[in-house]
Amino acid sequence: MPAITLPDGSVKAFDHPVTTREIAESIGRKLAKDAIVGRVDGELIDLDRPIEHDAYVEIVTSNDPDGLEVIRHSTAHLMAQAVKQLHPEMQVTIGPTVDNGFYYDFAGERSLSEDELETIEQRMSELAEADHPVEREVWDREAARQFFLEQGETYKAQIIDDLPESETITVYRQGDFADLCRGPHVPSTGKLKAFKLTKVAGAYWRGDQNNEMLQRVYGTAWPDRKQLKAYLDRLAEAERRDHRRLGRTQDLFHVQEESPGMVFWHPRGWRLYLEVQDYIRRLMRDNGYQEIHTPMLVDRSLWERSGHWAMFAENMFVTESESRDYAVKPMNCPCHVEVFKQGLKSYRDLPLRLAEFGSCHRNEPSGTLHGLMRVRGFVQDDAHIFCTENQIQEEVRTFIDLVYRAYRDFGFEDVLIALSTRPDERVGDDALWDKAESALATALETHGLDYTLQPGEGAFYGPKIEFSLRDCLERVWQLGTIQVDFSMPGRLGAQFVDDDGERRTPVMLHRAILGSLERFIGILIEHYGGALPTWLAPVQAVVLNITDRQADYARSVEQQLLESGFRAEADLRNEKIGYKIREHTLQKVPYMLVLGDRELESGTVAVRHRDGTDLGSMELEELVARLSNDIAGHEREQED
């Protein structure tokens, strides 16, 4: 009979196969009430599943991330049950959890709209109120397949067909609804108290655009209504900060159907883009990088030799000319190797740092495109460092300094780091991997940086460090990376002459600080809610006349600001001054300069900040000093 070891080290002996529910009840009524599932020797199981052997058992509640995951998975089933009751003709397919929630894909001719989400939620609430037991059943494979076919659930039958023969077929039943699932699930629908359906989208069956289009309903679920409300408030704030909306209201950029996944930059947006690019360019120039530029269209033979054609061809845009196949480059690395190969290099030339604002294109599925965050055409702040094995650690250490400096200057303080090590399938011997992994880890530890180890997550050609940012909404964005590459230089024939006159293959370090400039600008816009720091703002000051009498003076003020090096505009439209102020406040222009007859006569400007602060009347020289000081504060931080 099982002896159950608990997290506090105590052991409970039972004279019969015991369930996690019984174990929880033996500890206390509150724990039994709060229990969601059990964790038995590290495996999550349903509360009523018998444990027949000695085991280490933890009672998982909604306070445990695994408990919350189960709640969300079970809520996906609850939603599927509600949809089936409302629309019996629709088929259910799959319903996994995702970050902060879940989705379920439905098939059928009927279109689900966001207007129906409230009706579905109401039915879900009724089903939760009914507190149906959720029961796990083990089925014979063929019986399960036949059951779902008889129910008209052909997708479920297809899933069963694709499962390994060794797989145990389990069905979860709640009320009149049965679903194919591995589980585990909450013990009853009454455990599902706080949920919200958020949107409807399209999705291809199994993510393959050659398959039929399904309807995906997203939702979120939390242990209680307080946590749900907090999340929905964050969601609403994220909507207010959505870079696509701010891109329109601030006249920064747009995308359109004729060029999906490509960005049309407007004058203001392009100024922001160039400011970000110029910052990185200065950083590279001051730290020993040489900027290059390589072709956008490259013959497939180079991609075949680099290995990208075999691994990445489906994501390349390919064209043909004069019986030759060309690919629009999806990345810059092979071209950088070709630049390195021009002229034999000595060990004295290493490390050689080649940087490029490389324009890349990838044929991403149309359903994944999302404003600036997921595009088909983008520019990377890409660079490749060619070095010896002994130089890896120092180059990584220096790069980490650059990463932290850049993120700090752009206003990000919370940086998360992950170190990904050797996968099972890889090139290079273990000694080389040992050296590279040790170099990356030592560089991080020398900086006193905490990092998450991701065993087996490195590329086949080398380990890597990934840098992610946490923004003001607690969202995490993966941006920077530095990756050791033992493979590509050798594949493409890159060599240098070492100190004993022998030809050697250099190690190549792939590195980027921001990654895609488009994506980083999207993150910047959302992090600041469009109110970018003055040094980044596309328009730093706008001059607003009250009547036509001040128009010439407004043009003069604008011109003086431009000549002083500021990004300024004059708004001379025949509109009420209150309307102009509101409009430019919405556009998050840092300073608004209001000119009336009093300012015209005195040669001053009335200054308002975008936060609503009235800064009073200023001489133009005083305003220039204030703007300069605002921007200089950022520059002083860069120098620290």
Curated annotation (Swiss-Prot):
Its cofactor is Zn(2+). It comes from the Bacteria. Residues 242-533 are annotated as: Catalytic. Pfam families: HGTP_anticodon, TGS, tRNA-synt_2b, tRNA_SAD. One of its GO terms (molecular function) is metal ion binding. One of its GO terms (cellular component) is cytosol. InterPro entries: aa-tRNA-synt_IIb, aa-tRNA-synth_II, aa-tRNA-synth_II/BPL/LPL, Anticodon-bd, Anticodon-bd_dom_sf, Beta-grasp_dom_sf, TGS, TGS-like. Coiled coil: none annotated. Its main location: cytoplasm. Zn(2+) binds at residues 333, 384, 510. It is found in: Cytoplasm. Keywords: Aminoacyl-tRNA synthetase, ATP-binding, Cytoplasm, Ligase, Metal-binding, Nucleotide-binding, Protein biosynthesis, RNA-binding, tRNA-binding, Zinc. GO terms for biological process: threonyl-tRNA aminoacylation. SMART domains: tRNA_SAD. SUPFAM superfamilies: Class II aaRS ABD-related, Class II aaRS and biotin synthetases, TGS-like, ThrRS/AlaRS common domain. PROSITE patterns: AA_TRNA_LIGASE_II, TGS. Catalyzes the attachment of threonine to tRNA(Thr) in a two-step reaction: L-threonine is first activated by ATP to form Thr-AMP and then transferred to the acceptor end of tRNA(Thr). Also edits incorrectly charged L-seryl-tRNA(Thr). Belongs to the class-II aminoacyl-tRNA synthetase family. Homodimer. This is Threonine--tRNA ligase.
